């Protein structure tokens, strides 16, 4: 029996890192490991949780450091001093966490990849270097993948800790391009472990489908088009709006299942304005939707994301960039037709699997809209969606995660 400690800025809500952490937790628990959690925000079991507010990227001092260090090329001495002070504080708390739960292996979840919390990344790096504790860094996205991190005053810290090269540290990435870039930029060998879903357990039928559709104003024969993502610019929700405007349907509506997250309300407002010009009604229902597949199931929410998927007739996934494609895999799991932009990671890591979807290249045309309606009316649609499900089970199931993750964990024995 080994005790594993997950370390992140937050393990809460429905962001991709938290959801994938939950899946790793499920796999490790069912293989005899005990899991514990360290973060600045936690919705994990209280008796397995160690809260340190300074680990959160939204903590005021941490946010101040971020604001002072990005978008400029120099930093004040006081910022450097504060970074080292907080690094020392968080590192001390990591020692306490590992002592309290008798941790054998730590898994930093994106804490050594994206520099939203520089002291946390440095603290984890120093902790691993000082203790030699076995560690598996799960990288979801790197600083060089995002424009907002390119101009910065912390190249020294980025080279030092995002990510570090340490003897007892293994590295896991979620796509092939990230693997190549990590090897090329840092000379770090790594393992590709894709994001997954529990295909061995098909979804149970929701009893709320009729109520949800009626509440949103959909009649039985109306087309329910779902955008199952957060409302942020890289999701390219404009393309989904354009698609709905081109569909020859009675009610041109687009349902968005998630909230805007941490990136403000400018883009959500822009989508509403744009949709209004195109005669499309965009319905934001993120405040009513919780997760049923995370540490905290949001029992206070009226619906789950499962209810929303099962109510939909078509899923749109027009993202310009994704680290992997959780919503794509979810649509496959719930056996929904999906329109997807051929973003780079999809082209390399998902498309070759052979899924039957409606792809497009950056922009939507009337031809795409007509093809979608033809596909929805196809007498073999159910068979195609069943085949997609089997492909999902083959390439992106919990069993695939098990086969790839456990050898990494067991390599420390």
Regions found by a protein language model. Name each.
Residues 213-214, 218-235, 241-244, 254-258:
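Conserved donor-binding/catalytic core segment of Leloir-type glycosyltransferases
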Residues 337-341, 357-358:
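Short hydrophobic beta-strand element within catalytic cores of glycosyltransferases
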Residues 265-307, 354:
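Nucleotide-activated donor-binding/catalytic signature segment of Leloir-type glycosyltransferases, i.e.
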Residues 376-410:
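A charged, aromatic-enriched C-terminal amphipathic alpha-helix characteristic of glycosyltransferases
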Residues 320:
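Aromatic "clamp/platform" in nucleotide-sugar-dependent glycosyltransferases that forms part
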Residues 27, 36-105, 289-290:
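A conserved catalytic-core segment of Leloir-type glycosyltransferases
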Residues 152-192, 197-207, 270:
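A short, active-site helix/loop in glycosyltransferases that binds the activated sugar's phosphate group
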């Amino acid at each position: 029996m080994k005790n594993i400690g997950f370390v992140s800025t937050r393990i809460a809500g429905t962001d991709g890192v938290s959801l994938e952490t939950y899946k790793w937790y499920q796999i490790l628990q069912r293989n005899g490991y005990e899991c514990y959690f360290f973060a600045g925000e936690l919705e994990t079991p209280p008796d397995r949780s160690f809260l340190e507010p300074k680990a959160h990227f939204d903590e005021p001092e941490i946010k101040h450091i971020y604001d002072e260090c990005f978008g400029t090329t120099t930093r004040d001495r006081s910022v450097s001093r504060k970074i080292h002070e907080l690094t020392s504080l968080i590192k001390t708390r990591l020692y306490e966490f590992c002592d309290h739960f008798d941790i054998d292996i730590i898994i930093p979840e994106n804490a050594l990849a994206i520099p939203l919390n520089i002291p946390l990344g440095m603290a984890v790096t120093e902790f691993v270097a000082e203790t030699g504790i076995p560690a598996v860094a799960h990288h979801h996205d790197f600083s060089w993948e995002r424009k907002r991190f390119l101009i910065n005053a912390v190249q020294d810290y980025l080279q030092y800790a995002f990510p570090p090269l340490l003897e007892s540290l293994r590295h896991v990435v979620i796509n092939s391009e990230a693997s190549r870039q990590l090897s090329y930029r840092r000379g770090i060998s790594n393992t590709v472990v894709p994001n997954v879903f529990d295909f061995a357990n098909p979804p149970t039928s929701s009893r709320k489908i009729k109520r949800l559709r009626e509440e949103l104003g959909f009649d039985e024969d109306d087309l329910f088009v779902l955008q199952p993502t957060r409302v942020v610019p890289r999701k390219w929700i404009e393309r989904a709006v354009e698609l709905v405007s081109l569909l020859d349907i009675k009610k041109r509506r687009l349902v968005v299942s998630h909230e805007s997250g941490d990136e403000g309300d400018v883009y959500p407002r822009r989508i509403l304005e744009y949709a209004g010009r195109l005669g499309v009604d965009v319905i934001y229902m993120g405040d009513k939707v919780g997760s049923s597949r995370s540490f905290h199931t949001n029992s206070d929410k009226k619906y789950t994301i499962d209810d929303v998927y099962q109510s939909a007739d078509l899923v749109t996934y027009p993202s310009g960039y994704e680290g992997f494609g959780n919503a794509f895999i979810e649509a496959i799991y719930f056996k929904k037709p999906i329109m997807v932009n051929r973003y780079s990671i999809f082209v390399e890591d998902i498309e070759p699997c052979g899924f039957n979807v409606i792809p497009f290249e950056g922009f939507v045309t009337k031809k795409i809209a007509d093809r979608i309606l033809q596909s929805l009316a196809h007498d073999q649609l159910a068979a195609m969606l069943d085949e997609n499900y089997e492909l999902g089970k083959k390439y992106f199931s919990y069993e695939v995660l098990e086969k790839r993750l456990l050898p990494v964990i067991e390599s420390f024995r």
